[in-house]
């Protein structure tokens, strides 16, 4: 691979095309005629690789010929450990030219040690029926362990693959209905599912993002620290830049977590205009900034600061813009959006160049009657909650909010969000029953998300599977978690709420909180205070458990996993009961 020794330019030598291609390889064929590409930075902010789209195309075609030389066929699955590295891009697009289906596998992230990660990888390899698995040298030992005794044609890195013979065959023709890739869900409520996305679906979504969501300009430049195995990182920050012939700069996810201010430094130095993050990324940056440091950065060119992938709290964006005021950051850069892997990526975008809009509602009314009622002067402060508007759906989509009987609901009535459009998945790989549960025969996708419409815009309030149902009331776990996070001792993201079975076959709510204090009196006081405030503000009894720091589980993409937290809690209760029985 021939890498450039300086970043690829922002301005290009070929006319801009807004992702209007029939396939990813057609898009790369066009992007390769220009000068732009992908750039990779170390945790110290130093450029270590620049891969122009022309070089990427050349490398990808060579890889495709070697994949075909292994005896693989069009449609075979190729598992790729998705490290933020140029090798991953070469392998991913090599699969595209070979007509094979790349499957991005997560790198180590919030899993309980080596053995858990190996087991997780093996489960994904078996689930997708991978024919080969490739990774960087750093992950080869783990990959070999995870793939032991599996019927694979190849296990290794790019260097090993490059030494393989070239097939003396023509590259296959890629058609719109061919599978482009399999994207695993984050697994926030269950084991990750392999979402099957066709060339037609992903190209439709890329076009909508480029034309309607971001309204890309020739002067734009992307920067990302999001992992390649996450749909926002892969589709939004790998495929969108390539399909729009736009340069992109990458910082590895783990380096961002260690040095979040490097994100701001690179935004300042590269002149990037577009970057996306879940809300926790903005929160993490704020937590590492000391007074006066904002002026060290020039964020005046940051045109779009996208935010999505998890619930958006208005206070987080307000604090970030206030903290970064001296950097030239404009609050109007914030762009809330909504999407999911099952829809390729994007479903809706808020309007550009407007301040984020918040709908302040009475959460008691949602719990009791399922309607998002605006607050008034008599609404108690404890019942006030703000939800960000996530914009109008992209033009390709039909969107409905449906009630429990499948009826279509009117504005401000809360229900399950259903979408239909060309970007929607073909189904879950090797899971016909789950596909039938989620995708109707006439193309409607049950997102599993709860929300309502307001002035034509989507408002997301949570996940259906996360709902806590107490005495017929639907209670959002985020409302309970918010009570905890208002306490001075508890950081944002250090509390998870869920329901567990009660002895009378009903449900009871549980709040698990990470808390480093060991003093017994302080711990007791915090538990009692939380229980009392939850009872006062939400009207339910809640069992509060305090656990050590770094106990709460997350998905591979960093989202909180309430389902895993629930299972861990039940396991702790079981172990405690067994220990009590042994003592007795």
Positions of PLM-derived features:
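ANL superfamily adenylate-forming
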Residues: 45, 109, 113-114, 118-124, ...
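Conserved C-terminal "lid"/linker of ANL adenylate-forming enzymes
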Residues: 494-499, 510-511, 531-584
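AMP-binding/adenylate-forming catalytic core of the ANL superfamily
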Residues: 268, 275, 421, 426-427, ...
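N-lobe entry segment of adenylate-forming
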Residues: 1-51, 55-70, 74, 98, ...
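Conserved AMP-binding/adenylate-forming core of the ANL superfamily
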Residues: 39-90, 110-119, 173, 197-200
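Conserved pre-ATP/AMP-binding loop-to-beta segment of ANL
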Residues: 36, 165-184, 190-191, 201, ...
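Conserved AMP-binding/adenylation subdomain of ANL enzymes
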Residues: 203-221, 231-273, 288-293, 352
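Conserved AMP-binding/adenylate-forming
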Residues: 303-305, 312-337, 341-457, 465-467
